[in-house]
Amino acid sequence: MLSRVVLSAAATAAPCLKNAAALGPGVLQATRAFHTGQPRLAPLPPLPEYGGKVRLGLIPEEFFQFLYPKTGVTGPYVLGTGLSLYFLSKEIYVITPETFSTISVVGLIVYVIKKYGASFGEFIDKLNEEKIAQLEEVKQSSMKQIQDAIDMEKAQQALVQKRHYLFDVQRNNIALALEVTYRERLHKAYKEVKNRLDYHISVQNMMRRKEEEHMIDWVEKHVVKSISVQQEKETIAKCIEDLKLLAKKAQAQPIM
């Protein structure tokens, strides 16, 4: 069985090793795709997880299938028995005490395999499953880290692709700052002009008021100067008469 496994593995790996003769192992590892595509058969070929069927614990099933068309169903057994008797009769193989020791040891090995082989195989499979689980956990952790790195790289690339928006925002901020400065200076100029206009208006109003007061004083002085003593006496007498007349009218009216 072991020889058949070795031969099948060698036959499987022969084309890959033939093509990889001119390359080093590092190059072969570098050319292998990471988690994508079909796995390469170099530098190590895949080994079968379970062996083929055997009879008598040693003879491959393919040997019997090869002899069945030529010798029939009992042909392999007859051939094996005949060869054994031929080797014994011709003394090609001589039975010695070591032969019985070998038979005893082989029988003991077969008994141990039949008795404890299943439980031992389950124990080995359990250890293998634990190792596979650990390796799978490491693999998933590595894949997660790589995926996180890929997502971060994509996010960074997206930010790089949108960097022109940042320039537009900065350009708009500068334009807004210039507009605010322009508006502030315009408002300041408006206030300065308004204050100056208010000052000129106040000056004009004050000058007009002073001119009016001066005109009134001037007219009053000249009017008073133009009134003679006789006119003043006549005016006073006229006022007294008017007051007396008003007093009589007030006395003549009945009290309500």
Swiss-Prot record:
Subcellular location field: Mitochondrion; Mitochondrion inner membrane
Residue numbers carrying N6-succinyllysine: K131
Range of the transit peptide: 1-42
GO MF term list: proton-transporting ATP synthase activity, rotational mechanism
Major place of residence: mitochondrion
Keywords from the named record: Acetylation, CF(0), Hydrogen ion transport, Ion transport, Membrane, Mitochondrion, Mitochondrion inner membrane, Transit peptide, Transport
Coiled coil segments of this chain: none
Example of a GO cellular component annotation carried by this entry: mitochondrion
Entry-linked InterPro entries: ATP_synth_Bsub_B/MI25, ATP_synth_F0_suB
Domain of life: Eukaryota
GO biological process terms held by the UniProt record: proton motive force-driven mitochondrial ATP synthesis
Subunit note: Component of the ATP synthase complex composed at least of ATP5F1A/subunit alpha, ATP5F1B/subunit beta, ATP5MC1/subunit c (homooctomer), MT-ATP6/subunit a, MT-ATP8/subunit 8, ATP5ME/subunit e, ATP5MF/subunit f, ATP5MG/subunit g, ATP5MK/subunit k, ATP5MJ/subunit j, ATP5F1C/subunit gamma, ATP5F1D/subunit delta, ATP5F1E/subunit epsilon, ATP5PF/subunit F6, ATP5PB/subunit b, ATP5PD/subunit d, ATP5PO/subunit OSCP.
Function summary: Subunit b, of the mitochondrial membrane ATP synthase complex (F(1)F(0) ATP synthase or Complex V) that produces ATP from ADP in the presence of a proton gradient across the membrane which is generated by electron transport complexes of the respiratory chain. ATP synthase complex consist of a soluble F(1) head domain - the catalytic core - and a membrane F(1) domain - the membrane proton channel. These two domains are linked by a central stalk rotating inside the F(1) region and a stationary peripheral stalk.
Family: Belongs to the eukaryotic ATPase B chain family.
Name of the molecule in the record: ATP synthase peripheral stalk subunit b, mitochondrial
Organism: Mus musculus (Mouse)
Classification of source organism: Eukaryota, Metazoa, Chordata, Craniata, Vertebrata
